[in-house]
Amino acid sequence: MDELLGEALSAENQAGESTVESEKLVTPEDVMTISSLEQRTLNPDLFLYKELVKAHLGERAASVIGMLVALGRLSVRELVEKIDGMDVDSVKTTLVSLTQLRCVKYLQETAISGKKTTYYYYNEEGIHILLYSGLIIDEIITQMRVNDEEEHKQLVAEIVQNVISLGSLTVEDYLSSVTSDSMKYTISSLFVQLCEMGYLIQISKLHYTPIEDLWQFLYEKHYKNIPRNSPLSDLKKRSQAKMNAKTDFAKIINKPNELSQILTVDPKTSLRIVKPTVSLTINLDRFMKGRRSKQLINLAKTRVGSVTAQVYKIALRLTEQKSPKIRDPLTQTGLLQDLEEAKSFQDEAELVEEKTPGLTFNAIDLARHLPAELDLRGSLLSRKPSDNKKRSGSNAAASLPSKKLKTEDGFVIPALPAAVSKSLQESGDTQEEDEEEEDLDADTEDPHSASLINSHLKILASSNFPFLNETKPGVYYVPYSKLMPVLKSSVYEYVIASTLGPSAMRLSRCIRDNKLVSEKIINSTALMKEKDIRSTLASLIRYNSVEIQEVPRTADRSASRAVFLFRCKETHSYNFMRQNLEWNMANLLFKKEKLKQENSTLLKKANRDDVKGRENELLLPSELNQLKMVNERELNVFARLSRLLSLWEVFQMA
């Protein structure tokens, strides 16, 4: 696989140096001097990525990333021409730092004249690692299985923080500063755990290679390998080349995740260790799987209750590491623009979810991992309310005076005494209850019994939301390909309802369910006043949640001769919502940095070594109040950013 990737990186492109079309649309001056409001309408990605990189690497790195996001791939010479105040050396130095943190990818191309040029692309994966850096550390510490909680968690946090800040590192380099043998053994075992859990993977050329170019190289290679005198038609040749390219592409993509490439056995201790010279980096996809699980757990809480959601949480955590990727690399190649390819990709994804080993589970598997404090007894109804009503009705009927019975000779049989009839009735009711609840009594002894867990799994499988699918009796799996669109729709409706009101969500659902509707149909189905419907529709159109489609009645295209219908296009709506959330996150970061700049003198004074811990003595009352205000506003920014991030990532997931 290294040979394949090496060929892709050194492949000669005979097409020459191509010009970037987007360069005509946005000039460098526009990019560098653009205001926050204009950035929202032009490119929210540009605004967010520049603010993130500026906060971590400074102004120069932000300028380089801004150019790459706005104009696409650029060479060093082109970057120098477009960025004022930076020469070749400063651009190269900045690119080295960005490449080290995986914020930039590169590819070398050779023109017809033989001149080699290296082009640089921005890499959103590295930028997202900077965005999630604190959450990555917190998530890994939570998931790690360690003996000494405090000490080992601190070591794990230091390891992950070093990997994020350096981009990648080797175990040999990390242990070079450790003197104690016992500490070296502990750190080495923690590295093994991080690799086994999938949070650390081997860094390779793949992390610096553009996916689109890699796919294009593999496809052209296999297409050219087919003999020209082959009797196959051009369509079959392309289909065959595509299949072979997919096979090689999957092998290259999955290679960094293979533990055999990372772990080995120490001959001295016979224990598994990480190869000392292997460079390790953060596996963002593994972390995002955990974020996806949290989103699904929160959705389950709102739909099936908190107890069933806790059972669902164990099921997700059990299969999380082997679950499908958040975004399949094939979706980034442009291959799915073909409708047939998109459909076959969807079918294949559903098959993989069902057939992949480690993704199916049953109640016994979950019982081994349920926490001791979770008691499932009493979490399910033992009898339907309708049964009680029927029983009370029958008892009431029995209490009514019955018809008198006579013998042949006319003797009237007297009724039983009240005490005797009541005793017989109570004994009958007790017997019925014992028969109905006989099976449930066995479950009350074990809080984690398989039957109770299976009942909760059936609730998840029978829900309107496809939380689980049952392949065979008692065996389940999580259908991510069907569940993620439902999650997106649910979160989108929540945002619409919380910002525009419940009436907007009602209209949005009405239009989505009816596909393409007129205002007359909306008036008859939405059960709202006509004035309210029009004002709400205007808000939905402004937020790109609803679109207007003109349908001409005749050949005359004048407005008076046309009918205007409404429809919802989910792709456009989700994309607009994602960009809106992106801009709001970037705006929060922008305000935070601006706040620090305005109070830079006070912050420098408060951060001095001789002032720390003695602020009340050495700072004026006005300075203390100002410092308190700065800290409170910064905490407020982080809280709002966390909420926006949890919404934004839903629309980022494929």
Swiss-Prot record:
Listed GO CC annotations: cytoplasm; RNA polymerase III complex
GO BP: DNA-templated transcription
Chain residue ranges for the region called Disordered: 381-401, 422-448
Keyword Calcium in annotation: no
Entry-annotated residues carrying Phosphoserine: S392, S394
One annotated GO molecular function: single-stranded DNA binding
Biased composition regions of type Acidic residues, renumbered to the chain: 429-444
Pfam families for this protein: HTH_9, POLR3C_WHD, RNA_pol_Rpc82, RPC3_helical
PANTHER family cross-referenced by the UniProt entry: DNA-DIRECTED RNA POLYMERASE III SUBUNIT RPC3, RNA POLYMERASE III DNA DIRECTED -RELATED
Subunit comment: Component of the RNA polymerase III (Pol III) complex consisting of 17 subunits.
UniProt record similarity statement: Belongs to the RNA polymerase beta chain family.
Stated role: DNA-dependent RNA polymerase catalyzes the transcription of DNA into RNA using the four ribonucleoside triphosphates as substrates. Specific core component of RNA polymerase III which synthesizes small RNAs, such as 5S rRNA and tRNAs.
Protein name: DNA-directed RNA polymerase III subunit RPC3
Encoding gene, per UniProt annotation: RPC82
